[in-house]
Each structure stands twice: as structure tokens, then as C-alpha cells.
Amino acid sequence: MKMNKIESTIKNYIVRHNMWKHDGFYIVALSGGADSVALLLILKSIGMPVEAAHCNFHLRGEESDRDEQFCVDLCEREGIALHRIHFDTFTYAEKHKVSIEMAARDLRYRYFAQLAKDINADGICVAHHRDDNVETLLLNLLRGSGVDGLAAIAPQNGNILRPLLCISRQDVLDYLAEKKQDYVTDSTNLEDDALRNKLRHHVIPLLETLNPAARDNIAQSAKYLRQAKLMLDNMEKDMKPSDADDADSVIYIDKAPIMMAASQEFMLHKCIGNYGFHGDTIDNIMDALRNPDGGTGKVWKSNDYMLAIDREQLLITPLKALDNLQKEREF
């Protein structure tokens, strides 16, 4: 069967990003919405072996059950195996003191990871598209994110695959219209309660009145920023101490590569940001490093770590390890 333009675009994107292993098979996260329905049908059409997985979070009453039944009917018609699970999302959110959105995300990805292991799937395909990438970049820009956040959504993260990142939401809708395929609509996506929805319904359309190519241009910027992130991650990996992942070890970071970097603050943040040092603290540490004495002897604390400047290194010590040492001395 001949592939249409969208299917061909997706297949080329999958091949370019090495998402499809020989003889592998994949799980498609199927909500019943337009994006995931299109993803399922496209992957089936290009010959990618797939099974579907649906999560019922019981957040929208009868609408949640409607979505599940839609997925059951669709997979039966297409001859695709469907895995289903039900979650008490409200209880999980309350127990773990997280938002409903975060609870659903945690539950979803934990389930997908376990399911992939149970059925030996090679990857989990999720239906993020180019417009999701644009929204994510803008969200992270509003939050003051660095390159990591502005790089937005990666095509692949471990065994999580995003084959639709190369097409737009409108491409998805056009594909479904061409196939005469229906889908369900999550009524909460039409509300303006969430910041993402406000960006989707108001801010991005406004940007398009200023420049009709706004979505394409922002998505292209995200691509360039992802490439910059990969380069910086490789530099950071070269600088990372071998014991940096040991929860009880003192972490030693040489000053020299930071001081020789074209953007010293940026490199410092890449080195110590994961330990809870951000914003003004980064600026203050950098000011100290630039002093004639190199800031030797100065100390800062984050929620979990203490950073001290030595003559040639930054010493990062877990506060937990300091507490344990203090207890040993008292004993």
C-alpha cells in the first residue's frame, strides 16, 4: 500500500533518528485523542509492529470511560492488541503531594516502563508533535529556563520515542480527515485554566498575527537549541567527576575549565546547577571566583549541598554527609 505524504515524512523522521530497530516492536500510548490516534494509524501504515496502551485516570467521569471504549473499538477494528490500566489519580496525587497533572504523568510513564519490560517492547511511542514542542519552549522561556528547557522536547529520550515531532497539529487533523477517522476530544484541552492552554489558544495565535511563520520558526529554534544542548552535555560529561553520582561523596570540580569558558556563568551553572545552585547564587559564586584570591574559603548552601571554594577546585558536599560526620564526632 502506497504511503501518503505524512506517512512518508514520519517514516523518514523515524529512520533519521534511529527509532526503529530491526525486528523490534513498540507500544503506542493511546489516549483516543487526535494525536495518539494518528500516531497509531501512521505507525501501522508504515509497517512498524505496534501494540497500544491506554490509561484511564478517572479524572473526567463518563468522559474517561468513553475514551477507553473508543480505544477498545479502534484497536479491535485495526487488529491491534490493546493493554489497559485504571488509576485512582486523585488518591495518588494526595498521597504524594503532587498536582493532578504530575500524578497522571508519573503513573502513565511508570506503567509504560513496566509494560515495555513485561512484553519486551523496544520502545514507547508518544504523540507529541511540533506544536507541543513550540508550547514547551514558550512555557520554559516564561519560567526562565536555560538551554536544557529551551531545547524543549527531544525526538528520543531513552526508550520514549516521539515520531510526530516533525509534523504539526494541523497535519495530524488533515491526516485523520483524509482517512475519515474520528477521535475523542478532552474537554479540558478547551479550557484556559492551564498555562499551556492559554499559550495554545491565545499567545501563539497572537504571535502568528505578527509573523505567520511563528510556529515553524520557534520549532526551528528549539532544534538548534537541542543541538547546542547536546554539545554542552558532552562538554559537561568530560568535566564530570567520576564520583559525582555517589550520594555521600565530596564532589571536586576544577576551576580552570570554568574560568576558561567563553561564558563562565553558563559553564558554572552546567557544573553545579544539578546540586541546587541557581540564579543569584551562580552570579555570587562567579563574582567570588573572579576575585584576585579566587574566592578561596567562601561557602554557599543549597537545600541539599554545601559548596566551598578551594584554591583550584569547587568542593560540593552533601549536607546529609556533613550531618552524619557531625553525629559521629558528637558520639
Which residues does each predicted region cover?
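Hydrophobic/aromatic-lined pockets within catalytic cores
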Residues: 142, 208, 272-276
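Conserved anion/nucleotide-ligand pocket segment
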Residues: 200-218
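Internal, active-site/partner-interface "lid" segment
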Residues: 189-196, 215-226
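Alpha-helical scaffold segments in soluble metabolic enzymes
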Residues: 136, 202-205, 267-270
